[in-house]
């Protein structure tokens, strides 16, 4: 091969490599429209939605731990409330510091058949929007078991392997040891997590009866069998989020 041919081949290779690299960079840097639309603009409306979400969380906690024995409870959260709360109280109370390193600006989009979770990973030019599509349902044959089916995992517009996410989820559950167990299986090639609440309790004190998705909202319904025992078993997961109930 002549020197001229070699230089031409190298030049073509470099152009192709740069083109592939630029394409991958553009795919990773792509910001999904749903993620952008999920952001609630700052202002009085967002503040009110954040307060509504915080109040609903506090009422949910109170319902679960203070209702009379066997009394039913139910609560509804909209994705606008959740995203407003994540942008306001979640930040002001410094709860965002508990997010894994590199993750910021989480947002949710709730649809009738799935929940879309997205967040920014990294910062500046080296950041990307990671989006996760989840189908969610209560397992009928077992009490207090929620199934999460991971049907989509992207960095920008680029599909990526879910293995690292699965390992991270397993580690988090093992670290906390809060009576929540998780098992995995595959359905139609997609990983499915079976999340068991009060997994170590032979007689659960909290019974989930309904988790229903609709356009822009999620309903949660259940009842508590023994509120006093449940209060002793759980640490308040909302901590500084709680509002005074008096």
Regions found by a protein language model. Give the residues of each.
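Extracellular/lumenal and peripheral-membrane lipid-interaction modules
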Residues: 2-246
């Amino acid at each position: 091969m002549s020197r001229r041919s070699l230089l031409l081949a190298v030049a073509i290779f470099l152009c192709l490599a740069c083109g592939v690299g630029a394409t991958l960079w553009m795919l990773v840097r792509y910001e999904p429209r749903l993620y952008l639309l999920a952001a609630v603009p700052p202002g009085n409306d967002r503040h009110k939605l954040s307060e509504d979400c915080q109040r609903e969380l506090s009422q949910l906690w109170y319902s679960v731990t203070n209702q009379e024995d066997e009394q039913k409870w139910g609560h509804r959260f909209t994705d606008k409330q959740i995203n407003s709360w994540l942008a306001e109280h979640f930040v002001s109370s410094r709860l965002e510091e508990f997010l894994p390193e590199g993750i910021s600006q989480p947002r949710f989009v709730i649809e009738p058949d799935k929940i879309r979770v997205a967040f920014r990973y990294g910062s500046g030019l080296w950041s990307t929007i990671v989006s996760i599509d989840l189908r969610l349902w209560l397992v009928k044959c077992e009490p207090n078991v929620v199934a999460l089916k991971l049907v989509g995992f992207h960095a920008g517009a680029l599909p990526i392997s879910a293995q690292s996410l699965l390992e991270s989820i397993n580690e988090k559950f093992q670290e906390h040891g809060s009576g929540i167990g998780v098992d995995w299986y595959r359905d139609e090639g997609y990983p499915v997590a079976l999340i068991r609440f009060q997994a170590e309790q032979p007689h659960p004190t909290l019974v989930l009866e309904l988790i229903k998705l609709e356009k822009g909202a999620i309903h949660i319904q259940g009842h508590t069998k023994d509120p006093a025992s449940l209060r002793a078993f759980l640490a308040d997961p909302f901590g500084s989020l709680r509002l005074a109930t008096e």
